Amino acid sequence: MSVLVVDAQSQTPVVAVQLTLGEAEQARATGNDGRARFTSLPMGKLTLVARRLGYAPLTRVLQLPRDSVVTIQLRASAMSLSAVTVQGAARSDATFQPTTVLDGAALDRALGTSIAATLAGEPGITQRTNGPVATAPIIRGLGGDRVLVLEDGLRLGDIATTAPDHAITADAISARRIEVIRGPAGLLYGSNTLGGVINVIREDVPRAPIDRVTGVMSLQGESVTTGVTGGGMAALPVGPLAVRVEGSWRDARSSQTPAGELPFTDQQQTDAGVGVSWAGSRGHIGSSVRRFTSEYGVPTSLGGLSLPGAHVGGIYVDLQRTSGRVDGEYRPRSGAVTSISGAANLVSFEQSELERGGFVGTRFGQLSSQGDLVMRYRRSGALAGQGAVGVFGQWRDMRAAGSFTGTRPAVLRAASVYGYDEMGFDRLRLMGGVRYDAVEIAPLERTPTQLLQDVRDRRFGNWSGSAAATYALPAGITVGTSVASAFRAPAIEELYSAGPHLASFAYEVGNPTLRAERGTGVDLFARVARQRLSAEASLFRNAVTDFIYYAPVQDPRTGLPLRDPRLRRYVVYQAAQAPALLQGAEGRVQVEPVTGWVGDATLSWVQGTRRDTRDPLPAMPPWRGRVQLRRETPRWLASVGADVIGAQTRIPPAPGGVSATCTVVRGGEAEADVLPAELCPTPGATLLNASVGLRRVIAARLHAITLVLDNVGDVLWRDHLWRAKQVAPQSGRNLRVLYRMTF
């Protein structure tokens, strides 16, 4: 099949347009003549998606062999839009779900030093920080393993969700795109649909034939850390095989804040992978390997002030992840079954937390494996639609050692079966999913302590479900609702921890009697999609029974937060449960009053409350908004804007009758008189930002350079979700420069 892409206004060929055929899982880029050619395609209906920086994305439904030669026209637009269907608008396989997708120019502008930093600022998404590296995404107030982070659809196999000082072992610079999935489709990946799923898409294993060498090279620098990041990817044919090679590295020094240099925030990181597959019109089979290493610091002090319980010499984390993956898919020529696919991985993970002089305080080791088998189908007739059924299995063996560690070894086994379906009736679309999860956790160390009793095996199992409905009104308006019932088993750490965690400044104690969380969520949402107006808004209410959280333990003698029994240095946090309610709103509006000029505004707000006491839940993000004026053409872009972060004064009450402070003073109050960060309010801030970018096609290669200036006013501000906020503010003024060459 031959595809020609032209500019809708000038009718000239458009170079470097990314074309994808979803059903065939093939991707191509147009050359100097605006053409691309696809081979080994199945006959029947195919969905072609065209994306190019500076143009509105476009979707076209094709029918082979009739549409063997196709011409499509792209319209210049500065708006961040979903792909617009221009043929068969009422087709039965159209999908709608509340998702966020970052790719192209939007990904370049947002690209940060981590996945969480890249997504922060999107509606409903913020990040929890413990320095510039140890960050984690928070979706609608939920974090940890309530938010699944995947790489090409499989879990990473790291321990990022177990503590705030642990980093996600996936780099955003080499991602093709990053998706956030909510609603019924999230049940294809996990049982907790109240949070969400973040999928970093790279396609390590090529899924389609490759007929020529393609790739991308990236180089990024930033002033706040004097950091440099580089990366490259190439996909090439080697005989009958498709090969993909990728690598990236990062070298950054300590971060600069308006209050001075923040020690122990430097980082060195490498990431490399290679994938090989055989691919044809009926599917593919292949494998890949990847190696990720990182050494980074966790800040504990600034300007002579040290967080109570922190090591004066700082903490460094040294980690390595090695993973292998097999991936395959078969697509029948005809029938209701459209594909049968499977993927499995084996991951070896090691992490050491180093004190002054390279002394190992804690060492983690984990071996994990998972597999997924999915059958996708399509129906025709009165109940036309599509869906998927599948099975999933996971095994995880986590060990810990060190001079005095509170993390206990355990083995986790899990199995799931799930299904998802969607159908349409003219303007009405219905979507639903169901999943059953069984989880078994066996501790390998059962010795009780003063604070941890009744250590034993635990088994959990339950159903999760989600349903959604959308209705298309005139004038490009779509309204809908979704209802979800979610299940989450307690994590290993929540059950069995019993000791200090140096890099998170806490003595953490689990609770082997914890019950599984059970949540019920309701969403109401609306979307407007017009040529010069794009808007979406959502109201949500999530009620969680037996919500698990870490709370400071009160010392019965003093009324102050309890300190660890050995050194009386760390605040003791213990896993607790309470009925919780999380409710809020989020939205985004984009308006293009003049061609190429866009006003863009987003707002996110969430409130967490214990339903039994009506007290606020700890570690809830404040409301956050973003406004931006953007000018974008196919050749250049520019923007100015502001991030507005609200004050967070809605915090859990301090222990009754306690006289303590939230301020850390050099040589002042004793450590025991300083309240933990989650019991302290945080002021708001307004951060100005600006960006400019240039794109040129030279010798059939797209060159793009983007400059972004964050925190233009060098404002001193603090992150409410960081346990070290009383000591250290966030980064100051930062100039980021990104260069990409696509070939």
Residue ranges and their predicted role:
Residues 6, 20-22, 51-53, 65-109, ...:
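Short, acidic, small-residue-rich periplasmic hinge/interaction motif at the N-terminus
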Residues 223-251, 261-297, 316-334, 375, ...:
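Transmembrane beta-barrel wall of Gram-negative outer-membrane proteins
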Residues 426-430, 540-544, 562-654:
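Gram-negative outer-membrane beta-barrel transporters
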Residues 275, 360-376, 414-417, 509-515, ...:
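Outer membrane beta-barrel strand-and-loop segments of large Gram-negative receptors
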Residues 270, 277-281, 317, 331, ...:
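Conserved C-terminal beta-signal and adjacent last beta-strands/turns
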Residues 154-184:
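Short acidic/polar hinge/loop motifs at secondary-structure boundaries
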Residues 174-177, 182, 187-258, 265-272, ...:
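Outer-membrane beta-barrel translocator/receptor signature
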Residues 258-259, 263-267, 283-340, 346-370, ...:
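Flexible loop and strand-edge segments within Gram-negative outer membrane beta-barrel domains
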